[in-house]
Regions:
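Active-site catalytic motif of lipid deacylating hydrolases and related acyltransferases
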Residues: 37, 43-45, 72-75, 81-169, ...
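N-terminal module-boundary/linker segments of secreted carbohydrate-active enzymes
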Residues: 26-65
Length: 383
């Protein structure tokens, strides 16, 4: 049975095994990506991206205002998204029938980008949380960027390029398993190939991207650098978020590498040039994360009803890339004030080694969407 509870439970149990994981499959048939049902989102269909993303903006004094949202079917570029490990299927790899978790993650992480780009999100036979645990228990190698899941995404991307792209620029967006898959896709299919000129940027979130120590390249990619301004294109944005009060422990799942000449990369979407800045978060009003609902306390002390699916909390959160002895990460500071009328904390924690993985994307969603808009303008100007 696919339930929110089972997903949350599997996330906790899988914490000790969340590294990329190889899956043994007996040459299954490739997916038919000419079939619209093989896509969670496409710009030409009503699907998982066609959701209400209206937002209640809550100021520190408890004052409330409403913010609408709409997609832009004529957006000049495309976004191609690969979602994280969320499937509650009990098989090693998920099937191609989306469950509630796969639909929810589109709402939380990707649908909002449709205001600045045409959305493409293929369904794929990802390694499930149950599959991760089974592989670990069997002592097998752990590599999420190989096997059936990678093959599906590669096939979907190749189909997109051949039949949908038409020479347009694109942004790759991934989280967790999706980011590891996209990292390999960039290495194998994009870097050093003509299509690299069309890659406006890649958002590889909630994973570990490496660079040579003190450099912006030289690890995961040889020539594709980290993004250091919103006007820069052909670059990568990557981070894994942790609370300022709970930095990565020794057994962290993100932001570290065993290679002595490499280091984990971090780019702050709220301040690509460096330093600390307020983030533009879009949080679920019901406390939902990619693992299901969490929040029980009201957003404002008055108990005023929040009737939109999302909330924005200006000034509550700030972010800065930093390092400790274990990892490089995006440090999230919560500026709660018990004397004001607004909520003082956020949800998203699981165990210390995960950090705020469940809300990595939500924490800076507004910043990421704005970056796509600015990078698109810069890319078009240089064409």
């Amino acid at each position: 049975m696919k339930t929110r509870k089972s997903l949350s439970t599997l996330l906790i149990v899988a914490a000790s095994v969340f590294m990329p994981s190889k899956v043994n499959a007996q040459d299954p048939e490739p997916n038919d990506y000419t079939d619209g049902s093989a896509w969670l989102c496409r710009p030409d269909q009503q699907d998982a991206c066609a959701v209400d993303l209206s937002t209640t903006v809550i100021a520190a004094d408890g004052m409330i205002s409403l913010e609408g949202w709409s997609s832009d079917p004529s957006a000049p570029i495309d976004c191609f998204y690969v979602y994280p490990t969320v499937s509650t299927d009990q098989s090693t790899n998920s099937d191609m029938t989306p469950d509630a978790a796969e639909l929810r993650v589109i709402e939380q992480q990707f649908a909002r980008f449709a205001s600045v780009c045409r959305p493409y999100a293929p369904s794929y036979r990802q390694v499930t949380l149950a599959g991760l645990m089974a592989t670990f228990a069997g002592g097998g190698p752990r590599d999420l960027e190989q096997g059936l899941a990678y093959n599906d995404v590669r096939d979907a991307f190749q189909h997109y390029l051949e039949y949908d792209n038409g020479g347009r620029g694109f942004v790759l967006i991934g989280h967790s398993q999706g980011s590891y898959i996209l990292t390999r896709l960039i290495r194998d299919e994009i870097e050093g190939h003509p299509v690299q000129d069309q890659m406006i940027s890649a958002f590889l979130l909630g994973s570990t991207v490496t660079v040579a120590a003190g450099e912006d390249t030289g690890g995961s990619f040889q020539n594709i650098p980290l993004c250091r301004s919103a006007g820069q294109t052909g670059c990568v944005i990557t981070y894994a978020s942790f609370r300022s009060t709970a930095p990565p422990p020794q057994n962290t799942l993100f932001g570290q590498t065993l290679e002595p000449t490499l280091t984990g990369a971090c780019t702050n979407p709220a301040a690509l040039g460096g330093g600390s800045s307020e983030t533009h978060a879009y949080l679920s009003s019901g406390g939902a994360t990619i693992a299901g609902p969490r929040r029980t306390s009201p957003w404002v002390s008055s108990g005023a009803a929040v009737e939109t699916p999302f909330v924005s909390v200006p000034g509550l959160l700030s972010a800065e890339c930093t390092s400790n002895e274990h990892a490089t990460y995006l440090e999230i500071t919560v500026h709660g004030d018990p004397s004001d009328d607004r909520v003082d904390d956020i949800v998203g924690d699981i165990t210390p080694q995960w950090g705020l993985h469940l809300v990595d994307v939500n924490l800076a969603m507004g910043d990421l969407v704005q970056i796509v808009q600015e990078q698109t303008a810069a890319w078009e100007e240089r064409r």
